[in-house]
Design a protein with these regions (language model features):
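C-terminal motif of bacterial Sec signal peptides marking the signal peptidase cleavage site
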Residues: 18-20
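Bacterial N-terminal signal peptides that target proteins for export
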Residues: 1-9
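Sec-dependent N-terminal signal peptides
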Residues: 8-16
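Sequence/structural signature of beta-propeller domains
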Residues: 22-315
């Protein structure tokens, strides 16, 4: 088991203090990492309003051919969405009503996750009628599973728990894994996030007033509850999305946190799904929430933008 290293918060304080000395504002959506700012989540490269059928969209995954697969947390339907337009191109039924929270394609097998921890695999999913098998495993009862991702380096599926995974891990957030070859679930978490490490007293640090004001009601990360998860196909980094705190964490494969983004509320009403394409572009879906319509946002890696854009965004 890897306990996620949160010693980076000391470095984070230094980064914020430096920002306070050089700028009067620190826009939400930019990273406060220990290494770089690969994405700017206040500046989407594309934004799509999704069909009303997807008001409860909860899971997102690339399924090939520039298409996204999506599920919503009420009905057992698989939605195929054109990533370039946000339009639904196909809908296929795979099961009855249920709280479906995650979806992921691993090689040619599609996995769909329910909040009770049940995982269904579909070897032949690109057909009019989907027939799947339930993966036999036993997650902790209080896990409330909401994220599933394929870690290709280990040939395993990762499952994130929204709630505390039991007494021995009280107050922590866990990520379990099951081996694709055997279907066996790890008995202990492969990653363990201690949310107590995310408590951060703003008053103890000399941030400027703009930063202090923005962080005052959002820096307490004790409410961090993973709602979506994705593995970067190029780097193997793990991205954990949280609706409650409107934030996004990036971890390396050793479990070290390398970046934190606070997501601007005007773009992220209820972020639930996340997927990353082979180019490194991040797609995040929002349930309808107060806006009354769901959205799909695309963010390109900052390193892929022109140098002039990078300079402009940093000013």
């Amino acid at each position: 088991m890897m306990t996620i290293n949160s010693g980076w918060f000391v470095a984070l304080a230094v980064v914020l203090w430096t920002a306070g000395c050089t700028s009067s504002d620190q826009p939400a959506g930019e990273a406060w990492p220990t290494d770089d700012s690969s994405y700017v989540f206040s500046e989407p490269d594309a934004e799509f309003t999704l069909s009303r059928e997807l008001e409860e969209i909860s899971g997102l995954s690339f399924v090939g051919g520039g298409m996204l697969g999506a599920v919503q947390d009420e009905d057992g339907d698989l939605y195929i969405i054109d990533a370039a337009s946000g339009q639904i191109v196909n809908v296929r039924s795979f099961g009855g009503p249920g709280d479906y929270e995650g979806i992921e394609l691993a090689d040619s097998v599609l996995y769909i996750l329910r909040s009770d921890g049940r995982v269904y695999s579909f070897a032949s999913w690109n057909t009019p009628e989907l027939e799947g098998e339930e993966v036999d495993h036993n997650l902790p009862n209080r896990c409330d599973a909401e994220g599933i991702a394929y870690q290709s380096s280990m040939n395993r599926m990762l499952i994130s728990c929204k709630e505390s995974p039991g007494r021995e891990h009280r107050g922590k957030k866990a990520i379990y894994a099951f081996d694709r070859a055997t279907g066996g679930l790890t008995t202990t978490p492969v990653y363990l996030l201690d949310i107590n490490d995310f408590e951060f007293n703003v008053e103890e640090h000399p941030f400027n007033e703009a930063i202090r004001s923005m962080l005052s009601d959002r820096i307490d990360m004790s409410g961090f509850k993973p709602s979506g998860m994705a593995v970067h196909p190029q780097t193997g980094d793990l991205f954990l999305l949280s609706t409650v705190t409107k934030s996004l964490l990036r971890l390396d494969d050793a479990g070290t946190v390398t970046a934190l983004w606070l997501l601007p509320a005007e773009l992220f009403d209820q972020p639930e799904g996340i997927a990353i394409d082979t180019n490194g572009d991040v797609y995040i879906s929002n349930e309808a929430g107060d806006r009354r319509y769901a959205t799909l946002l695309r963010f390109s890696e900052r390193s892929a933008r022109s140098q002039s854009d990078t300079v402009q965004n940093s000013e």
